[in-house]
């Protein structure tokens, strides 16, 4: 439900969503991994391949396609199925990037510092060099990082404010982030153990 007081927020979020799709569509992914097996995995998934029941029939990157986690490719292939434009699958990088910015800002909002510093620090947290260099590609390290930031921030906010919304964001970030690559399972697992 859109109330009068959160209409500007909805407009900003919708604009960022549209931006994510448009910028992903017009910027071609020229990364090796992106072209070699991430996009091929998405094509296989779009064409009905179920990695639980069978091996892919891919001719390129078969080892990586069949054996690596497919969290990012699954999300991207859903976008690809919806739009029929493979490059638009990269919009998940932008969406996760914006989510990490807003989650960081939400945590920094709890501190007694100037608003401009909160925005600056949230920007620096979300838009770090790895994220900036990978947001236009199907590389997945930036996506792991963005989900980890969301996971960390949502747990901080949940412990501070006790709102279930933050717990749901934490669980979603944890599940999505840990399904992207094998090392992300370790990263998120260590985080959970340290809680």
State what each model feature region is.
Residues 130-144:
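Short acidic/glycine- and proline-prone juxtamembrane loop motifs at membrane-interface regions
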Residues 27-41, 47-75:
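Extracytoplasmic catalytic/substrate-binding loops of multi-pass membrane glycan-assembly enzymes
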Residues 120-126, 153, 174-178:
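Short helix- or helix-capping micro-motifs
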Residues 110, 151-166:
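Membrane-interface transmembrane helices that cradle and orient dolichyl/undecaprenyl
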Residues 88-112, 150:
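Transmembrane-helix motifs of polytopic, lipid-linked glycan transferases
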Residues 1-23:
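Start-transfer (signal-anchor) and selected internal transmembrane alpha helices
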Residues 155, 166-182, 188-193:
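Membrane-interface alpha helices of multi-pass inner-membrane proteins
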Residues 71-92:
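Juxtamembrane segments of multi-pass membrane glycosylation machinery
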């Amino acid at each position: 439900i859109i109330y009068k007081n959160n209409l500007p927020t909805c407009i900003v979020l919708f604009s960022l969503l549209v931006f994510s799709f448009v910028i992903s569509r017009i910027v071609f992914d020229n990364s090796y991994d992106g072209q070699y097996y991430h996009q091929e995995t998405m094509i296989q998934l779009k064409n009905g391949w179920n990695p639980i029941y069978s091996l892919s029939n891919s001719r390129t990157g078969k080892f990586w396609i069949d054996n690596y986690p497919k969290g990012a490719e699954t999300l991207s292939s859903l976008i690809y199925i919806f739009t029929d434009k493979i490059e638009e699958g990269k919009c998940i990088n932008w969406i996760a990037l914006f989510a990490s910015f807003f989650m960081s800002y939400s945590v920094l909002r709890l501190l007694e510092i100037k608003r401009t510093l909160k925005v600056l620090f949230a920007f620096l947290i979300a838009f770090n060099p790895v994220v900036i260099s990978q947001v236009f590609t199907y590389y997945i390290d930036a996506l792991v990082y963005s989900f980890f930031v969301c996971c960390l921030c949502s747990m901080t906010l949940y412990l501070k404010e006790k709102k279930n919304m933050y717990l749901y964001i934490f669980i979603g970030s944890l599940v999505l982030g840990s399904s992207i690559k094998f090392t992300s399972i370790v990263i998120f697992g260590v985080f959970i153990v340290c809680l």
